[in-house]
Amino acid sequence: PNHLVTLPMQLLTPQWLLCLNHTTEVLENQAVLINQDLIQAIGPREEMLLAHPGAERVDLPGQVLMPGLINCHTHAAMNLLRGAADDLALHDWLQTRIWPLEGELADAEFVYDGTVLAAAEMLQGGITTFNDMYFYPDQVVQAALDVGSRVFAGITVIEFPTRYAAEAKQYIELGIAARDKFKHENTVHWTIAPHAPYTVSDDTFRHMAMLAEELDLPVHCHLHETASEVSDAESRDGIRPFARFEQLGLINERLMAVHGVHLNEHELQAMAAKGATLVHCPASNLKLASGIAPVAAALKAGVNVVIGTDGAASNNKLDLWEEGRLASLLCKGASGDATAFPAGQLLMSMTCNAAKALGAEDLIGRIAPGLQADLIAVAVGEAAHQLPNHNLISKLAYSGASRDVKHVWVAGVQVVQSQQLVGQRAQLVGEIMRKTQRVWQTRVEKVG
């Protein structure tokens, strides 16, 4: 594991430092000292250089150093299904394309290979942590470790048989076994991940809620994604899925409710009061014509709103810069309030607020002593589209781009240097890319 390798101290000297320590203050002439996997100190550049002459100096001129981005909802392995199911509404997308494809193809090898590609795409775009929900979480984790990303893997349950498991009990047992297997890895974390109200029973939800309490983990679940999910539940159960979640005791600070496109004012108030999080995935919601989540109302109610890309089969990119920009612009346009979801709040929703949602506030999402060194250096003065720089926060929020991310560190290890994956990672990703063109493309088309 990474953390057993001793790394030299690294002293990073960026032109600008954006700590996002629940504030959007931009500092200049600062240095950040990394010791092993941790941020050890932050201070004035000259003082730090004198105090740590032995540290390996990494000069970052024309760049801003900031916390790595946190993608709060994805299905990484679905990178192999990118472009396999387009221009369909959610129900048709799942029933006619995705579930049949997964039934045929989604084995351990599929999950490993797809997650390797996704982790590479995300790291190169400045995403250092992804919150995943998929089958074979042991493979998800192995892929993340091999590429160098931090991962929150889901102990996923969907109550129908797949290649991975037959019924709820087995899904849970396999998930717990995977968690035990990787318990010594400092970049591997877990969530309890029931798929959705329409694929998981009350008994299983109750059991998973208990498990989340017992293991102190977040609960990661799709909720109110489409209008039909809500109306079907009303005619079937006489109650909206959200109210059912309330009865089951799921609406609390552990809950990361994904999509929430069809949440009403009362439900948003309840989420805010209980400290639940809304994970907003605007591109997927637009592409599947699910609608536009009530983000302005959620923020006004005091709900913690964070951002996810969803999987590449419904986005079709894993680009958090683009996702965040879309989230903010949609929020303004849909609410008629140009001040809604401002730049600073957007950047925090992809860093410190995302960490809070994952119960990892003291671990990631900010640049502060004692936190994990998950950092990205973003070029802000090298290309025409990056200038001028009189408002860095606005620049990053509204015109920041994956192609501007130069260097990436995860747990103190530099995994991307000058936009390229470092070391063995590049070879691994190259191999899987070739295999995808040779093997997976054909297999996906065959099921087609």
Cite the ranges covered by each PLM segment.
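Active-site gating loops and adjacent loop-to-helix segments of metal-dependent hydrolytic enzymes
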Residues: 80-113, 147-169, 226-254, 274-277, ...
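Divalent metal-coordination and catalytic microenvironments
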Residues: 15, 32, 37, 62, ...
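Alpha-helical scaffold segments that flank or form the walls of functional sites
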Residues: 82-148, 171-184, 433-437, 445
